[in-house]
């Protein structure tokens, strides 16, 4: 953010944000490349031209010069069905502009959040909050005292024009808003895509992820704004969002702050739902609202959320996108884990003088398990096994060297072990490892035109053990008495604070 401020030199005292002139500044496209979420399309032309993967100002200048030439930017205004052509390499030019627009449109939000008094305090606690695993200890501490959950799918806007109208409250630059409309209508088929019940994020264009991720995150930001009153009612709410919005998948910032102004009549209505034990958490398009309240209160929440989203935000939220469940007999599908709160009965012996008593008590336990069926489906989509879980070879990797094949399978196995180290039961994880191990063996046997049995008999099975036991070897350096710990590894849960993105195989499920 310091780099953005240094480049742009924006006067924060101005009440209005005029962003359109920034489109003609070359450094904006440099920032779009340097601060991109994913590998930029600029990497490919630089490789073809013999450059390395660093930013090249010469390439940016050439692209901007070509975009300024009329013969490469033709707009047919008299045609009843206008089409836009961006020269011979329209995809590259179009992505350059869209990435620049994405950087510019984030500025009003980022600068306001940086200028907030809470930002410095939040930066101090960013180290552990970056990890996805950091949310599970929080859930274990809070959900044990709650009764019901609302499984909510984030609603979608009726029309993408509503996103532009909502942005008008943040950006008062009319030419820039017209440019946003241009990009939205370029993807006119979005209105049919976002009405699907599948994950909205899957429809993002691979070439313009930053632009559409911003729109999606702004949409989620608005839909979550109804929970701002809870921070004023109870300190128990720990809802988080990111500095430049949360769902960048590689999310790198989280803050505990909402910057949304509410109408006075909202407070009167929302006060009826005062609940000091309510908890809210979200990832991508799915959110969970848990409470200690009665089923009647949860039904009120469901009715109120649907009506508020539809009537005040014009978001299309069907009632079947919100489900009421009881925590004691429900699994929460969140971040690739199946989490649950299970009552565990136990007996306690109490002795007073010469008499003893046995007291039966019930203790709630927070469990997290690996969803085996969705993971097998993901492995099947990636061609590691069939949908029944039977391992198959990976023909696409058969041309690689033996060490490269083993390294690829080992990396997948280690990443899965690392991500699902917080599972209460490791049996499902061991089955996934078994599938990957046999798939690796079948791939090597296919390469050497041999059977799996004869191949393992000739080379021995030890060469496949190293990447399957990586997690246990790491733990031996961290925890003492590893021989004792290895016996309990099946039941122990370990959360890591260096995981900043969900596992790729989990995203496929």
Swiss-Prot record:
InterPro entries: Domain_X (IPR024937), Maturase_MatK (IPR002866), Maturase_MatK_N (IPR024942). Keywords: Chloroplast, mRNA processing, Plastid, RNA-binding, tRNA processing. One of its GO terms (molecular function) is RNA binding. One of its GO terms (biological process) is mRNA processing. The keyword tRNA processing applies. GO terms for cellular component: chloroplast. The keyword Lipid metabolism does not apply. It comes from the Eukaryota. It is found in: Plastid, Chloroplast. Its main location: plastid. HAMAP family: MatK. Belongs to the intron maturase 2 family. MatK subfamily. Usually encoded in the trnK tRNA gene intron. Probably assists in splicing its own and other chloroplast group II introns. This is Maturase K. It comes from Clematis terniflora (Sweet autumn clematis). The gene is matK.
